[in-house]
């Protein structure tokens, strides 16, 4: 892979889940990579261990002799490193543009959707690895079977998440597209659902004439795109008209069984070690692509049944005194709803939730929907809102969700602003047999081990 005379690249916000994977791929291909981030985490520690220089904080001197500066969506325009790069006429590009360059040199498979991107990409990557195709895989989460967020393969395929935020996915050049779900989100950027759907249509139609668009027939918004799609369409889902279909679905604890059909022909039975029908649909998306490549059913079955999941997706952190603690990345009302439904099916016990809202704008736009989705839990604790890339919005706090949940009938809901007090609050309430979930896209995952410690006492 050659980028002309560009040899040194600096990543601003290198600890971001989408940034670190690209940095690692380029590092593995011989580029000199440096990066900076506001905080040091397991991700930045990993990058340091493999030889990438990472510094904490953003100052102009960090870019050193970089030939190009790569920034994430979370980086503000007044960032001193960005300003220094512009002053010195060093190219500044967004993460998605760099991912587009990587994808341009491979047969790219872009997985897009409001929900399910990470799990679908992870399953597909694992499946292609098991099929011996040695793909490059770039995921927005740590794939347990890969042990990382990225795998650099020698094959022709590159599988990556395609993020719709700020139309980032329009920078990509996919040879094949996967559309999981479409729903209102990122309303700080998009005007409405119609604008979101138009962006997804534009993304899908970037597929060349020799590619295909694999879409979820169970999602009405995705289906609504079909009349405007100009490339071959393949469908997956549980509806009887889907090309790749699951039937006889049985949820059993944290796993799901189903029969797989392709064009109404039964291929066989699959035991998926993931909970919920939503994960069956994620698996079907990956299977649809696998069948496009003529991967045999037995290989598909073996790959799915050996899939170990994704970090922060229904992720068991540990158990203490008969109380299990899970962590999940859900940060949209629909994601919370399907996670808690799966939890109720899996455990048949009391479910305690610690939810940390992510983004002021999302909380403002969906606080009532969040409250409704959280009514299924037996105890609800709201943590302080995680702002991520946003500045505060007057009057918008986690208290809005707490108040709405109480208004809608939740009998055991609290807002605890000090996150350090949450573990003891859980320990006082929890009983053997209960299940605790920390939920959110911010740093709430760090509270899960602390809850386990509190449960020891």
Predicted features along the sequence, with ranges:
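Nucleotide phosphate-binding/pyrophosphate-handling subdomain across enzymes
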Residues: 2-10, 18, 25-29, 253-254, ...
């Amino acid at each position: 892979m050659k980028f002309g005379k560009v040899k040194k690249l600096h990543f601003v916000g290198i600890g971001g889940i989408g940034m670190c994977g690209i940095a690692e791929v380029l590092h593995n291909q011989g580029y000199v990579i440096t990066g900076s981030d506001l905080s040091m985490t397991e991700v930045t520690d990993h990058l340091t261990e493999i030889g990438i220089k990472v510094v904490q904080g953003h100052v102009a001197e960090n870019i050193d002799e970089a030939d190009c500066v790569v920034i994430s969506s979370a980086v503000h325009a007044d960032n001193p490193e960005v300003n220094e790069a512009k002053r010195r006429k060093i190219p500044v590009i967004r993460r998605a543009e760099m991912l587009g360059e990587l994808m341009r040199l491979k047969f790219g498979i872009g997985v897009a959707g409001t929900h399910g991107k990470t799990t679908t990409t992870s399953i597909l990557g694992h499946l292609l690895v098991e099929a011996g195709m040695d793909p490059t895989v770039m995921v927005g989460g740590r794939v347990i079977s890969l042990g990382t967020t990225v795998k650099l393969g020698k094959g022709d395929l590159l599988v990556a998440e395609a993020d719709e935020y700020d139309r980032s996915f329009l920078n990509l050049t996919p040879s094949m597209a996967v559309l999981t779900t479409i729903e209102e989100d990122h309303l700080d950027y998009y005007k409405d659902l119609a604008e979101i759907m138009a962006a997804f249509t534009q993304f899908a139609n970037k597929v060349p004439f020799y590619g295909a668009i694999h879409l979820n027939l169970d999602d009405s918004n995705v289906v609504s795109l079909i009349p405007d799609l100009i490339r071959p369409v393949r469908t997956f889902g549980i509806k009887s008209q889907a090309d790749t279909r699951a039937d006889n679905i049985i949820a059993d604890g944290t796993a799901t069984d189903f029969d797989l059909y392709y064009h109404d022909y039964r291929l066989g039975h699959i035991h998926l070690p993931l909970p919920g029908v939503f994960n069956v649909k994620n698996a079907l998306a990956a299977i649809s692509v696998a069948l496009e490549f003529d991967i045999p059913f037995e290989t598909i079955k073996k790959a799915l049944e050996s899939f170990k999941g994704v970090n922060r997706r229904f992720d068991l952190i540990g158990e203490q005194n008969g109380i299990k603690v899970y962590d999940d990345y859900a940060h949209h009302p629909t994601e919370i709803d399907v996670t808690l439904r799966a939890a109720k099916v899996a455990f048949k016990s009391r479910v305690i939730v610690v939810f940390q809202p992510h983004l002021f704008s999302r909380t403002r736009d969906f606080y009532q929907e969040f409250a409704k989705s959280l009514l299924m839990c037996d105890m609800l604790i709201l943590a302080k809102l995680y702002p991520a890339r946003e500045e505060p919005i007057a009057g918008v706090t986690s208290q809005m969700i707490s108040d709405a949940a109480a208004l809608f009938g939740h009998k055991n809901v609290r807002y605890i602003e000090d996150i350090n007090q949450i573990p003891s609050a859980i320990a006082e309430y929890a009983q053997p047999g209960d299940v605790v979930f920390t939920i959110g896209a911010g740093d709430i995952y760090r509270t899960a081990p602390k809850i386990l410690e509190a449960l020891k006492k």
